[in-house]
Amino acid sequence: SSTSSTSSTSSISPAREIVLSGINLGTYGRDLTPRIAFLDLLRRILDETSLERLRLSSIEPQDVTQDLVDLFASADRIAQHFHMPLQSASDRILAAMHRWYRSAHYARRLDLIHDRLPHAAIGADVIAGFPGETESDHAATVAFIERHPFTYLHVFSYSPRPGTKAAAAPHQVPAATIKQRARELRSLSDSKSSAFRRSQIGRTLRVLTLHRDARSISEHTGAEYTPALSTNYLRVQIPGIFPSNQWQDVAITSQEGNYLCGQILESDPPPLCESSAYSASLRYP
C-alpha cells in the first residue's frame, strides 16, 4: 500500500553522493538519436537535480577533455577524482592489448588534470605480466608511474581467460615473475598514496561521513572515530561518533596509516556522543 511504502522510506536519508558508474562512461549518448554528449549529461545532472556530490567511477583517458576538466574545476558538486585505466605504459603492450591510446596521450591527460586541479585524486588500473611483457616493458610502466601525479593504483596480476587471444598468445610471463612485478607496483602505489595524503596536511577537506562498525576504534588511543570520505577520495577519521551521510569540515593535521587526521571546524549535526578517549585538541589517529 502507499501507506506502508511511505513509512518504509520516510526514515531513509537521501543520498548526498552518487557514483556514476558504467563501462566506457565517456561514450554515453553516442548511440542515441539525437546524439547526447557525456558532458551534457553531467551538466544536466548538476542543473536539474539537487545532488550534493557526483563522483565518476572511471573514465577512459581519450574521454578526458579540456571541457570535462574545466567542468570539474568549476563545479564543486563534482568529486575531484579521476580514475583512468592505464594497464601499461609500454606502447608495445598497449598495442597488443588493443588499447586506443599510447603513453604520451595518457601523459597529456594527466598534465591536463593536474595543472587545473592539483589536489585531485588520480587513480589507474595496471596489469602486471600481460603476455609478451618484458622487463623493459615493466620498467617503462614503473618509470611512467613514478614521474606522474598518480595518487593510487589498482594493480591486477594477469591470468589467462579461456578463449581469449591473450590466453593463446606466445611469450606468457611466468607466474613468479608476474607476482614479483605486481608486488613492485603495489609498493609504488603505497608510496604514491602516502605522498598524496601528506600533501593534504594543512588543508581543510569537506568530507562525507560513512557507516561506522566495530573496527572504528583507534589502534593508538582507543578513541572511537567515524570514517569519512573527501572529494579527492581520501579516507579521513573524525573523532567521536557521528551519523553517516553528514558533511564535516576537517582541518587536516596528520597522516596515520591509510587515514588522514585533523580537527573538526564545523559539526552538522553534533556528535551522537563523545568517546571517553576523545582528546580535547580533536586530534586523532
What are these regions (language model features)?
Residues 1, 11-28, 82, 104-115, ...:
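Proteins enriched for Cys/Gly/acidic motifs involved in redox and nucleic-acid/cofactor modification
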Residues 3-12, 276-283:
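Short, low-complexity, charge-dense intrinsically disordered segments
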Residues 14-136:
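Conserved SAM/AdoMet-binding glycine-rich loop
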Residues 20, 56, 84, 125, ...:
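Conserved, mostly hydrophobic/aromatic
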Residues 28-46, 50, 96-97, 160-191:
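Radical SAM enzyme [4Fe-4S]-AdoMet core and its adjacent flexible, acidic
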Residues 133, 148-150:
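Contiguous mid-protein beta-loop-alpha structural module that forms a pocket-lining wall or clamp
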Residues 168-285:
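Terminal RNA-binding accessory module
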